[in-house]
Amino acid sequence: EIMLAHRIQQGLLLQKALTCGLEIAEQAAELGITVADVLVCCGGGGLTSGIALALEQDAPNMRVRPVEPEGFDDVCRSLISGKIERNPTTLGSLCDAIVTLSPGQLTFPIMQRLCHAGITVNEEKALHAVQLAHDRLKITVEPGGAVALAAALFHGDQITSDCLIAVASGGNVDRDVFERA
């Protein structure tokens, strides 16, 4: 029964993420962008797979790329192996909001079908992205929600499109962590 509740939660998050994907497609179309790498912070895959589903229909040339913290890259490894991989623990990361033991049972098949290679970033880069988001973009984002921005800023060598969209999510950052950034 716990697993059933977890699957329901994944489904609800996936539905909410569809809205984000639709907004990305709409704004990209307004700007004339038809091809882009779309970097999405990824834990269990609800946000990532929901965005991928929306873009599949409305912007099929967008390349959704999950982004995870180094050492907690279960989705990236799962996409490479073709089967669900597990992290040994969920403890020990500043990006705790997106750290999961494994991709979701509902979300992994969607990501497997629709997502491109994932990217991992270290915590130092995630913290730097938190700081830059605050200082330059005037938004507060937690480290886990800043990993996509960190990938955009510091892993340009892994970006394959001329256009780039990075999803920043979650503003629940502890004062101590924010001050470290």
Locate each region found by the language model.
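PLP-dependent amino-acid enzyme catalytic core
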Residues: E1-A181
